[in-house]
Amino acid sequence: KEGYIVNYYDGCKYPCVKLGDNDYCLRECRLRYYKSAGGYCYAFACWCTHLYEQAVVWPLPNKTCN
């Protein structure tokens, strides 16, 4: 599974500036999911890869980013 890492509180994606390989996104994806997850910056938000099927990613139901 893949998807944008999401803030559970406000429903927003984790923003990033440096597109492509990005240490911040990789670190955040691994902290949120687990160490075998990958992550990079895509369309100015952190995209996580190699997630388990039950992983919660953007968009969250009933939560819009404010």
From Swiss-Prot:
CDD domains: neurotoxins_LC_scorpion (cd23106). It is found in: Secreted. PROSITE patterns: LCN_CSAB (PS51863). Expressed by the venom gland. SUPFAM superfamilies: Scorpion toxin-like. Beta toxins bind voltage-independently at site-4 of sodium channels (Nav) and shift the voltage of activation toward more negative potentials thereby affecting sodium channel activation and promoting spontaneous and repetitive firing. This toxin acts on human Nav1.2/SCN2A, Nav1.4/SCN4A and Nav1.6/SCN8A voltage-gated sodium channels. Also, it reduces the peak of sodium currents in Nav1.5/SCN5A at all potentials. In vivo, is lethal to mice when intraperitoneally injected at a dose of 5ug. No activity is observed when injected into crickets or woodlice. Has the structural arrangement of an alpha-helix connected to antiparallel beta-sheets by disulfide bonds (CS-alpha/beta). This is Beta-mammal toxin Co3. Keywords: Disulfide bond, Ion channel impairing toxin, Neurotoxin, Secreted, Toxin, Voltage-gated sodium channel impairing toxin. Disulfide bonds join 12-65, 16-41, 25-46, 29-48. One of its GO terms (biological process) is defense response. Belongs to the long (4 C-C) scorpion toxin superfamily. Sodium channel inhibitor family. Beta subfamily. The keyword Transport does not apply. Residues 1-66 form the LCN-type CS-alpha/beta domain. Gene3D superfamilies: Knottin, scorpion toxin-like. InterPro entries: LCN-type_CS_alpha_beta_dom, Scorpion_toxin-like, Scorpion_toxin-like_sf, Scorpion_toxinL. GO terms for molecular function: sodium channel inhibitor activity; toxin activity.
